[in-house]
């Protein structure tokens, strides 16, 4: 049975989202929570029912790291450290909200360790996925987590 695989890179402003239908990357976008919910309601559920496909989400587990962030430069200003910790906390809350959304729809969520794969390496991303459209670091990261779901 084929699946709809959703890759997610959680963020406080807009999540990187990648959708694989039947093993092929079809949607790559940045979306906020409401946009993602609309996509689930208007597309994923219908496609899942029409094709008898399961939906599975593969997400970067930002909750798996400590919010007490140590800067590379130990002499970094305390305000910089606090701002970084705040951003990590916001991303963690975003992940919690995403998981609640998927739980509401009874969609299976698989968490993956944080990875920088494909964030910077656009050429490798395009070679593996055959994606020719626009992408950014967050959407490529989401595509990577979705790709991990294809390989399971």
For each of these PLM feature ranges, what is it?
Residues 2-152:
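Phosphate- and other anionic-substrate recognition elements at nucleic-acid/protein interfaces
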């Amino acid at each position: 049975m084929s699946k709809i695989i959703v890759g997610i890179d959680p963020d406080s402003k807009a999540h990187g989202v990648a959708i694989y239908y039947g093993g092929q990357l079809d949607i790559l976008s940045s979306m906020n929570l409401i946009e993602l919910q609309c996509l689930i309601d208007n597309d994923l559920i219908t496609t899942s029912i029409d094709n008898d496909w399961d939906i599975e989400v593969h997400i970067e587990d930002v909750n798996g790291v400590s919010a007490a962030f140590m800067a590379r430069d130990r002499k970094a200003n305390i305000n910089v450290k606090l701002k970084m910790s705040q951003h990590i906390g916001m991303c963690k809350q975003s992940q919690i909200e995403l998981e609640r959304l998927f739980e509401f729809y009874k969609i299976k969520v698989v968490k993956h360790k944080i990875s920088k794969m494909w964030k910077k390496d656009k050429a490798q991303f395009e070679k593996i996925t055959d994606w020719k459209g626009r992408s950014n670091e967050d959407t490529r990261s989401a595509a990577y987590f979705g790709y991990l779901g294809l390989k399971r």
